[in-house]
Amino acid sequence: MVTTSGQTTQGYVIEAYGNLLRVRFDGHVRQGEVAYVNVNDAWLKAEVIEVVGQEVKIQVFEDTQDVCRGALVTFSGHLLEAELGPGLLQEIFDGLQNRLQVLAESSFFLKRGEYVNALCKNTLWEYTPKAVVGDVLVRGDALGVVKEGYFNHKIMVPFSCFKEVTITWVISEGEYSVDTVVAKARDADGQEYSFTMVQKWPIKQAFIQGDKVPCHEIMDVGVRILDTQVPVLKGGTFCTPGPFGAGKTVLQHHLSKYAAVDIVILCACGERAGEVVEVLQEFPHLTDPHTGKSLMHRTCIICNTSSMPVAARESSIYLGITIAEYYRQMGLHVLLLADSTSRWAQALREISGRLEEIPGEEAFPAYLASRIAAFYERGGAVRMKDGSEGSLTICGAVSPAGGNFEEPVTQATLSVVGAFCGLSKARADARRYPSIDPMISWSKYLDQVGEILEDKVQGWGEAVKKANYFLREGSEIGKRMEVVGEEGIPMEDMEIYLKSELYDFCYLQQNAFDPVDCYCPFDRQIELFALMSRIFDARFNFDSPDNARSFFLELQSKIKTLNGQKFLSDEYKEGMEVVLRLLETKMVQTA
């Protein structure tokens, strides 16, 4: 079992450069080890990022003002770890897993060197043992369960225990705090272990026990353009790059509200503090459409905003994914929303510059692509020993400067994700929300989704490809019309253009502030998409471009009204009949 050394190494500061300190020490220090720097009776948390002989470079997670040459540094003997156990949900952490609500009680402003336990030690949890004396277990096996909200939170053999252990004692059912010993065990060498409800794990190491399996279940998010044009599977990875003001954060908030997953980890890494405040104000009052419970019951927030130290941005990303992996091991489906990975990459660039490493493109470190790949590879679906499956879906927002998708962070991300939802400034300016551009977005999961839906909807994949064809052709025809006008193109092209505009306006665009249209269930999407496919296949008889435009504008209005009606209500059914009758008045034949 991995344990913390009882002896601590000490050293002293010999050079300070911003939040990077050079420290000389006597003893043994590991890469990634946590250190504490003494400043005016406060101890500032830091991480070892480079070891050279008897000197190390450490990045401090707080303001290093007043740090002087000779300041005492103590090395803790353990890596930067996450504390995992009951009580993570409904909490708001910073990048070092301090509970911000507890810190707020002590002072209006965050004090330097003040840290609190990640899990409340006073809360009592109803514990039900599952293991019995004599059971032979390995890491990740269940010792018992507690009820956390409406989830069965599995208390597992710690992942730091790499040996088979035999249970020698189990606590009886009852209410206990997280630091209560709930089981004891012994390994083959006779070493004794005591297990509590809490375990710790280094955040930069993958937290997984079981077999990775191919993703095979659709993640319904209630956004038509995502579910249809750019689908994602549970356990998949996707990114949402876009310029300032394109709607990245609003889209991520929508995903956190309506995605068909069990747990949502919202990692606000370097974004504006106002957006985090909006989440904290809204979520407790919003209802999860899948369970009817408060959204906060399934949400954990790590809000390392741009006003916090740059060094903590990196730790917040890794903390978020470690918590997500922990819940995946319980057989739950988890969605991690990282907003934004560009701020994390900028933190890497800053630290790399202070380490005087050879820079890569745009001064980002040469290892940027491998760091981003390692982050996204921690996602995926996992089958546990008991046959249950859990998944971790990762969505990373990318904020390229000026909306330039050719910059290094976006390109490194595109090479490893399974779907790309590119947000367009032009669509946002035209108020075509969500502003995901279907012309540049893609998904590697489209064929798999078609196979999954084959029993329910025959030819789904081909129908989506046909819709993409109309979008591409309509876009090209629209560009020609800007030059030669409507009179300069044949009626067949005019028809294709109007069909593509109808599909964009009535299907791809969605009103996030409408109580009905904000979330479109998959069954409703299938019915609406079938209507769109029928319109694509239809042939119409128009004697002039004006008549064609008038007809499609009327059709747009009827379908848009239909989108605001409750699914399968009397108003919805009447609206659908009106649309079908209107189609039949101009339809000549069906291909």
Swiss-Prot record:
GO terms for MF: ATP binding; proton-transporting ATP synthase activity, rotational mechanism; proton-transporting ATPase activity, rotational mechanism
E.C. code: 7.1.2.2
Keyword Protease: no
UniProt-listed SUPFAM superfamilies: P-loop containing nucleoside triphosphate hydrolases (SSF52540)
Catalysed reaction, written as an equation: ATP + H2O + 4 H(+)(in) = ADP + phosphate + 5 H(+)(out)
HAMAP family reported in the protein's UniProt record: ATP_synth_A_arch
Family that this chain belongs to: Belongs to the ATPase alpha/beta chains family.
Protein name, per record: V-type ATP synthase alpha chain
